[in-house]
Amino acid sequence: MVEAVKVSELVKDLPSLRVVEGKEYLDQKLINTSDISRPGLELTGYFDFYPKNRIQLLGRTEISYSARLDHDLRERVFNKMATPETPCFIVSRGLPIPSEMLEAAEKEKIPVLSSNMATTHLSSVITQFLDEKLAPRKSIHGVLVEIYGMGVLIIGNSGVGKSETALDLVKRGHRLIADDRVDVYQKDDKTVVGEAPKILKHLMEIRGIGIIDVMNLFGAGAVKDSTEIQLIICLQNWDPKANYDRLGFNEKTREIFEVDVPQVTVPVKVGRNLAIIIEVAAMNFRAKKMGYDASQKFEQNLTELISDNSKKDEGDSRK
């Protein structure tokens, strides 16, 4: 988990933001929460519950109200709003920035930013960016590919063939997100997202060949930066004593950050085309999400057949 984000990262990743004052302080100021403050009551002088550690975002309402205050009161208010813990001030809609704010920010070495975006939209964009940056994170040993627009995480013991299978999937037109190590973070209560570490981005390790650059070999369409993990495929070496699911009735899940992700176990055996099997597993999962379950259809047909045979047997016995 990233404990804090530098204001410089915010400015770099959101081109709509421009620095008005305090460029030299961008690397010094840290943001440790995705919550954003709209200082309305503070402009009236009420600071009892002032969230000083949040980004202070001022829109048309706040700027127009501050313009009605006399100079001394406006100066006192902005001096109180500017604290050592305050990461930055942001003014939306390209509105004029009060000189009292600039002076107060300079005293506490706080960057002042501006944007032409509407306040609500800007707040949403910043919150989404910070949610992703500050989200809980962990690494999973596996390969992440996107099959027909659906993120599939392939896991299994070392040497079982995860990378080779992913390479086959890439050749079949699917996309690689990460090989060997997948960095995973929780986007919201029901969504986990996977991406590659920067040092491994677009790279794969194939035993006997070494490191290959997938984007260089197969083109930009063969890779993607990140994707939601919707299905997990667990590759296991074939065990003749194991009882593998042959009908698909027993649905299993794997918990990642308290999010239950469906998991399918695929036994690995010489002669099995794993890429096609995983491709079909992804399509079958998508069909289930759309309301069609082949295993349930089979069970329904079997029940109807048994029922018809029972009725036929009853009729024959009466004769």
Curated annotation (Swiss-Prot):
Q: Which GO terms describe its molecular function?
A: ATP binding; magnesium ion binding; phosphorelay sensor kinase activity; protein serine/threonine kinase activity; protein serine/threonine/tyrosine kinase activity
Which cofactors does this gene product need?
Mg(2+)
Q: Please, one GO biological process term?
A: regulation of carbohydrate metabolic process
Catalysed reaction equations from the record: [HPr protein]-L-serine + ATP = [HPr protein]-O-phospho-L-serine + ADP + H(+); [HPr protein]-O-phospho-L-serine + phosphate + H(+) = [HPr protein]-L-serine + diphosphate
Which parts of this chain are annotated as the region Important for the catalytic mechanism of both phosphorylation and dephosphorylation? 204-213
Catalytic residues identified in the record: H141, K162, D180 (proton acceptor), R246
- PANTHER family the record matches: HPR KINASE_PHOSPHORYLASE, PROTEIN YJDM-RELATED
Record remark on domains: The Walker A ATP-binding motif also binds Pi and PPi.
Tell me the subunit arrangement.
Answer: Homohexamer.
Q: Which NCBIfam families match?
A: hpr-ser (TIGR00679)
Its recorded name reads HPr kinase/phosphorylase
Name the gene for this chain: hprK
